[in-house]
A protein has these predicted regions:
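Generic hydrophobic, helix-prone segments enriched in Leu/Val/Ile
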Residues: 15, 86-90, 107, 168
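Eukaryotic acidic, Ser/Thr-rich intrinsically disordered low-complexity regions
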Residues: 1-13, 26, 122-169
């Protein structure tokens, strides 16, 4: 099948169509080409669409979904709007929790691993409506609960999650 990657909209449509990588016409190389074009040419308006492409049921390499998360950060940073990019992601929590809970959680883990994002993350969280805030807090609680290091029983994310929660109250 011939796919046209002439516009950002076409790229996003192709990615959305192929996100599960379970159809005969789905092609990871085309998906990656479309994502690369979005990454290099899209503006902040593409972030919400990227959130909707994330899906836990993808049969393709998980790197494709991870690349979407990285693209969200990349676009936000490129336009010097990290807080807004994070906010757009977080304000779609109620949608993503239905079909991309693993990738939603991965986004938070990526932020927790990157202390220089905390300021933007905390500011974005403070802007959330109640529904999205509850989902986020539940997710942070799960991350904190699940990540006990096996060697010494210490929770790697506990201090980081506690800091974030304390900072938003």
């Amino acid at each position: 099948m011939d796919y046209s990657l002439n516009s950002i909209e076409q790229c996003l449509q192709i990615m959305d169509k192929m996100k599960l990588m379970c159809n005969e016409d789905d092609d990871i190389e085309i998906f990656d080409e479309a994502l690369y074009k979005v990454r290099t040419e899209a503006d902040m308006s593409a972030i919400e669409r990227l959130c909707n492409i994330l899906d836990d049921k993808t049969e393709g390499p998980c790197s494709a979904m991870e690349d979407i998360l990285n693209t969200i950060f990349y676009i936000s940073e490129k336009y010097k709007q990290l807080e807004q990019g994070i906010y757009i992601f977080l304000s779609n929590s109620y949608k993503m929790i239905k079909y991309a809970v693993d990738w939603y959680e991965m986004f938070h883990r990526m932020v927790l691993w990157t202390p220089n994002l905390y300021e933007y993350y905390i500011s974005a969280i403070k802007r959330l409506d109640k529904q999205n805030l509850e989902i986020l807090l539940h997710t942070l609680h799960n991350i904190k609960k699940e990540d006990i290091e096996k060697d010494n029983g210490k929770n790697f994310f506990e201090e980081k999650v506690d800091f974030i929660i304390k900072s938003i109250k």
